[in-house]
């Protein structure tokens, strides 16, 4: 038996036992790396002489309210990564600003009237966009969701910022239209040629189904503190922003 065959067999066995979950992360990073925005993002973050403004827009999961039980949410973890861990020494990017404007219950449709103000107020370099959970619950029109998401991406680009779309993580509520909304985010990202973080794909690999792992969730819709750790891990891997010896990215991810 050749060494290649042995390695293939071992990887297959690891995948079956749930310990080999890197495929979606690697694939998404490769997809993102082909885009001009990926190079632009890395040029910005590697320019240590110029602080960056990072803006997060989204719903209660972005806000991180209540369901982490006072522990950090994924936006706060990201702040730790960029402001302290990234660069040749701790605190190299200490002057970066990370703004979380997540609103409980928000949808892409609901965000649109406020988008111009937020973009003008904060003048971001990068905007992380995460909608879909409440859009599926409250509106239920996938085509409208895609249209509104595209409009948000367009406004971000007009503001000379880099948009990063996020596919929402899995839930345990069993709602039938969740996969359609995940596909909608992917479709908009491809159409608009923008960076994408696919939480749902990684969570599906971890659970082996379309339902989130119970120990990553606080209730049917909201991730707990561990779930938020998984989210920032996914962001870092898929955008290729992984500080060497990062304590944040070494957090347990069972």
Predicted feature locations:
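Bacterial N-terminal signal peptides that target proteins for export
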Residues: 1-9
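Bacterial N-terminal signal peptides
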Residues: 8-17
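Short glycine-rich loop/turn motifs that provide flexible caps or phosphate-binding loops at active sites
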Residues: 17, 57, 63, 101-104, ...
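Sec/Tat signal peptide C-region and signal peptidase I cleavage site
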Residues: 18-22
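Mature soluble domains of exported/periplasmic/lumenal proteins and thiol-rich metal-chelating peptides
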Residues: 23-24, 254
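Serine-esterase "nucleophile elbow" of acetyl-processing enzymes
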Residues: 24-101, 116-123
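Alpha-helical cap/lid subdomain in secreted, periplasmic
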Residues: 76-86, 90-95, 106-252
